[in-house]
C-alpha cells in the first residue's frame, strides 16, 4: 500500500482496495483521478477490443490534464533477449519467453498481446491520450516496471496525458 493510491486488482488481496476488471471502471465517476498507474496490466487484454476499451476507461476516469503511467513488457527488448543464445542458456530463455506470454500460474496470468513503443503509442492515441512520453522508470512502487534480465531493463515505461480540453464536435453544415 502507498498513501494516496487506491489499488484495483482482479483478485482480492491484503493491498487491494477494489476487486474488479480494469476494463470496466463503472464504479468510478468520470474525472475521478489525477493519475492512474498500471504496471504489467495491459498485456493481459486482447488487442482486438479489450485493450482499447481499458485505455478508454482509464482516460475517462482521469481529470483533464491527468497522467496515465503505464509499464508493459517491451516486446522488442524481450525478442532481442530471447535470440541471444550466446548470452542466455535454454532455461533462461524459457523464462524470457514466459515474460512474453505470461507465467500461466493462474487463469489471469496470460499475455494476450505484445507491445512495443510504436504499438503502445498507437493504442494510447486511439484512446484519446496525447503527449505520450517514454520514461526510464516510474519509481512509484517496487514492482515489475523495474525488472531487468541480465543488465537489460525489460519494461516499456510511458506517461500519457489526457488533454486539458476535449475538442468540441464540429457543428453540422448549414443547408
Model-flagged regions — what are they?
Residues 34-49:
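A short SAM/SAH-binding and catalytic strip from SAM-dependent methyltransferases
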Residues 1-3:
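Conserved SAM-binding loop of SAM-dependent methyltransferases across substrates and taxa
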Residues 11:
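Conserved SAM/SAH-binding beta-strand->alpha-helix loop
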Residues 15:
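Short alpha-helix immediately C-terminal to the canonical SAM-binding loop
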Residues 46-57, 63, 67-168:
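S-adenosyl-L-methionine-dependent methyltransferase catalytic module, highlighting the catalytic core
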Residues 170-175:
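Boundary detector for helix-to-coil junctions that initiate low-complexity/charged tails
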Residues 7-8:
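Conserved SAM-binding motif I beta-strand of class I
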Residues 20-37:
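A short acidic, Gly/Pro-enriched loop at the edge of an enzyme's catalytic core
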